[in-house]
Amino acid sequence: MDLQGKCVLLGVTGGIAAYKMANVASALKKLGADVEVIMTENATHFITPLVFETLTGHKCMVDTFDRDFKFEVTHISLAKKADVVLVAPATANVIAKMAHGIADDMLTTVVLAAKCPKLVSPAMNTGMLENPITQDNLRTLEHYGFTVIPSESGVLACKDVGSGRLPKEDVLIEYILHTIARPKDLAGVRIAVTA
């Protein structure tokens, strides 16, 4: 599928799997997508914004109050521009913030303002993922219309074995493609059928 004319917003949070999102950004660009990346401050400890800027050709946003850009209300303009948002790897911290409407950084303000489909791919230690609080937060996001991409199982960065791995890049891209190609809801649209 060609993603020409589509904007994919990647929200990268502070998990060890953050580096994998560089391959996702690169693959989406090859499919013709306009890729924007927002990183949390914690994500910058795992991969630098420069990597995403080089791959996408856009400034990678981290700081909500960054003044090194043309004047616009950046979090709103990015929210309006996006055809789909993918937050991956989604940490327990960012999942909790999104589930409760906490918008205290660039990523969470954009997600809160975005009206496009939103995908969340949790990636964390099994104990954190299976914690009832995290599970409640994921259900809350689903209730609000987010699509939660199931984590994969395997050996985690902490050497535990279990669920919590970020899915492979092609799985994440397939979710994006499916979401963009999904037929739009026609609720509230008047259609005249004539014979």
Please annotate each region the language model reported.
Residues 1-119, 125-195:
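A cross-family phosphate/adenosyl-ligand binding-site feature
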